[in-house]
């Protein structure tokens, strides 16, 4: 069976993950690929827009997830699905409640429930601007609520990378990355042992980290297994007080997964910086 895999963006990243036997192209170029037998389509991440693009480009409906599967994934991608793992975070569906939340924490982050990679985020200190309130009202109307989180003084970002299949959710490894104002910048190519040591060195209570991992594992088994198949990355951060928090879950390929695989293939790159441009 031949295996066709393509990336919505960044075909070289997918080529690294899936090897030379895979054809990695942008979505708009799918129609240029010769299809000589059964194939699989694996984008950077699934959503209804990607599926429609593929159908227009000639992909077989049988090679794509069903509309029901896309709908289930969209529900998982709503930030409320992971609130039980996020201390202090709340789903707020009314402006007065948003004012109450800001009164409690003073420095907060607002996030649109269907957003990721630093998009759909607003930073607020002490009072809302008119633009903040307009944005929040619009998000609540369109996405049911807005997610509010206390703003932490972040000293370290890292992620745990997984692949979900039919029977289980497998842990692939850790990734260590840098952000600026919540937006990804680059990964450091460190092995899992080095990243674990770095995590522990920043924590004031390792038992709380162990407990959070146990809660995450239960959540993956109860909420993800059987509902989603594919890669996913769980982002964490540690604040200046040495406490660890879960930031978000990305149901797609991630740069952390790519960096982890790159280091596996190029162990001599240990300790260097990795970003999409690293692949040329």
Describe each model-derived feature in a short phrase.
Residues 200-211, 228, 240-243, 251-280:
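C-terminal active-site "lid" helix and adjoining low-complexity regulatory extension at the edge
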Residues 184-241:
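A long amphipathic alpha-helix within ATP-dependent nucleotide-binding catalytic cores
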Residues 106, 131-186, 233, 237-245:
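Phosphate-binding site of ATP-dependent enzymes
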Residues 108-135, 156-159, 181-200:
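Glycine-rich phosphate-binding loop of ATP-grasp-fold ATP-dependent ligases
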Residues 3-14, 76-80, 129-134, 204-218:
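Well-ordered, non-membrane alpha-helical segments in soluble/globular domains
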